[in-house]
């Protein structure tokens, strides 16, 4: 299994990576089934979703369950398909034509269901997973509190064991709970003797209630409510994982959520580019389609480039997880693998959400004044996608996680930055190698390798200057994370170009040879 973050230490293109062109016919069929479901059953009622028509969203999710879209990652033994992350990625990508539905769908299949997949006991899995896979039960995830947003461990919800040791009594309030208005099952985090613990709480438990829907900037049709816990009696059998180890569940569930968010951003970005490309060829100004003008074509090109890199990044990460999970002996080992790829998960989340935000902004610009009006779908996309930079930990927090995690691993020796720093210092004196100078795209392989060295060198200089206090230098850490994030995206796109057999790529090769 490849170490998380080790892409910084490897030569670009030295190892094969999973690319979208390797999707199997079955995986492509899953994507097509998802796309057809959303286009035929969700998009036609998008105005009703936006108006928050009562009971519509849970009805659509249950229909998705009937079609089989909720069961991809649920084990076959629990009524699911037992598929991997690549399959889940293509499902997530194709669920994005309606923003509010996508949020509800991803919440249920991701942070709503997967905690039981990874940490549930056999009894918990048998009790809940079949119902979650079919849509009979719908799920939500309750971590955030009024005073515990980015600082999730500051939560004040508590759980006390009853004298007979049969129940925990939960008290507290969670906020911004996606799917909270209709969910049947919540993964709730509360402290037992000051230590974070996860619980499976059914909405039917006495003392569980929800507050009014939040009035949001976007994703109007998704449910976002406070969850109120008043002396809720939860059986000890509903403790998820170990008492006092809830932080592990919370953070690793967010790692899964970050990857899924990145996958969703791929689909939404594709949708926006398709809409915009169609519009600019239909919109006439100065006697021509505006799509004929260079500045508009440049916008389409910039969006397409960023999409190519994002798609490459997300599928490479999914492939890494599938490869790792295929050799895992049990759920505990899979959890360690999620933690191993925490850096890649944060990169997928930050890069994905910011690419989508860029493309949604360019879509508005290409539509001109019409893009600013709610008669055009790009206006809704612009509002809906803004929350992605807040979901699953803000992009600022994730930037700190990217560089902070890599520094911790370098300090502990998990990643051998010291040897690489020595190599870099030597190269500064003798010169940097040009191993691919004569190869097609070889120059870019060398450039990416140089940027990787730059990121490691900046980390080393930062540690030398600030020592242990480097974790307080947020501006530096964020800048390093941006270098790492962009480098990872460029490398993934480059590896895809080198591995793939794209007709356009082959044409470019022929043209280049003829010019010689």
State the predicted function of each range.
Residues 46-51, 308-351, 364-367, 464-467, ...:
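C-terminal helix-coil-helix/basic helical segment that borders enzyme active sites and/or dimer interfaces
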Residues 20-23, 29-30, 97, 209-311, ...:
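Glycine-rich beta->alpha junctions and the first turn(s) of the following alpha-helix
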Residues 2-4, 40, 68, 76, ...:
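Alpha-helix capping/hinge segments and adjacent helical runs
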Residues 138-161:
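A gly/ser-rich beta-alpha-beta helix-loop segment of oxidoreductase catalytic cores
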Residues 148, 175-181, 256, 387-392:
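Glycine-rich phosphate/pyrophosphate-binding beta-alpha loops
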